Amino acid sequence: MMIIVMLLLSYLIGAFPSGFVIGKLFFKKDIRQFGSGNTGATNSFRVLGRPAGFLVTFLDIFKGFITVFFPLWLQVHADGPISTFFTNGLIVGLFAILGHVYPVYLKFQGGKAVATSAGVVLGVNPILLLILAIIFFIVLKIFKYVSLASIVAAICCVIGSLIIQDYILLVVSFLVSIILIIRHRSNIARIFRGEEPKIKWM
């Protein structure tokens, strides 16, 4: 029972719509009505400006980061292979990612899970996140597309999990990569059409 409560709590925390709340609270804007219509960090930078964008990014990363430690903090004990699987920090973090993408508070229309996924990886393997961040910014510097950099970093996470032989991370990163590609399908189409906005600060 405690495992179910923990996973539900992780989902609900992940579902907290940082961009939407910051937009409404400080700018009286529904961020979903501007830019890409997304509630995540990238659209927050675009619509609300850099300070708000950084705040939303921090909050979204933090959501994923703290949920990784729920099994430890809540002292949830596993007594079998199934319960052991669902008390793994990565699996608990996955529920936060799903909450971010499909938030119950906003009729299941959320962000694209990049920052929250980064928070989960930060909690599990900071060195891997550092490597992925370097890859992200290299791709971003070259191509100027946040969406492309995010997808490449996610795929590299899958490859990295194979290299370090972390098979739960492999499962989670593969699922997240699929989610990211699906959530970025309109961005991918715009890139091929040459219509995807490029960043101007790098």
From Swiss-Prot:
**Any idea of its EC number?**
2.3.1.275
Q: Where in the cell is it found?
A: Cell membrane
Its primary localisation, in coarse terms, equals: membrane
The catalysed reaction is: an acyl phosphate + sn-glycerol 3-phosphate = a 1-acyl-sn-glycero-3-phosphate + phosphate
Membrane spanning stretches? 2-22, 54-74, 85-105, 120-140, 141-161, 162-182
* Presence of keyword Transferase: yes
Which InterPro entries does the annotation name?
G3P_acylTferase_PlsY
**Gene Ontology biological process terms in this record:** phospholipid biosynthetic process
Q: Which NCBIfam families match?
A: glycerol-3-phosphate 1-O-acyltransferase PlsY (TIGR00023)
Please give the PANTHER family that the UniProt record associates with this protein: GLYCEROL-3-PHOSPHATE ACYLTRANSFERASE-RELATED (PTHR30309:SF0), INNER MEMBRANE PROTEIN YGIH (PTHR30309)
Self-association and partners = Probably interacts with PlsX.
Give the protein's recorded name.
Glycerol-3-phosphate acyltransferase
Which species is this record about? Staphylococcus aureus (strain NCTC 8325 / PS 47)
